[in-house]
């Protein structure tokens, strides 16, 4: 069977149209989880970020701004960064786990009930959380070196959550299998990743440039948009993985 990016995109749009209520619900829940956790554990750090944004012209970079802070303020900012990363990690894991499980159940024509919103075993959720944390750290290290290494790791690791949940492999085996499959199907996977990344950058620029909403609402809308486009990418990658020849998955 010949697989093309256009055919996968059409399948993705068709699935999105037929299952959009549940997909939107997952997006709303994951965005709410991220924003609520962030607002609970990082309420005092926003004043530092707001101060930096107001006087951004005084500083050449965020590092220059950090050097002007007291030790306590630096600790607070570090805590805020870790907490924000944690909230994003939890929200992303919730979205990935539930959406992949839902698509898998739909593909096997299983009955969908309200339990789908809490259908992931805790061990599987924690395992997926570890996988996303590991791949995120490696990707961020890649971006610290240069854009190309970071972007390449995003592509190579893109199928690992799907493989982890469907094949029930270990974290390292899921990453290894994802790398092998993406290298063999670069032309199919890369366009979707580029579209997803460009959309994320576009949304971040739009929301950061236009100050129509409060910081809380703007952050929620940002997460909402990013999670929605991420859902489309997950559907695309899931469909891609399922129709690949079996010998490529081993």
From Swiss-Prot:
Its main location: membrane. It is a multi-pass membrane protein. The chain crosses the membrane at residues 21-41, 86-106, 125-145, 146-166, 188-208, 216-236. The lineage of its organism: Bacteria, Pseudomonadati, Pseudomonadota, Gammaproteobacteria, Enterobacterales. Keywords: Cell membrane, Membrane, Transmembrane, Transmembrane helix. This is UPF0259 membrane protein bbp_256. Belongs to the UPF0259 family. It comes from Buchnera aphidicola subsp. Baizongia pistaciae (strain Bp). It is found in: Cell membrane. One of its GO terms (cellular component) is plasma membrane. InterPro entries: UPF0259.
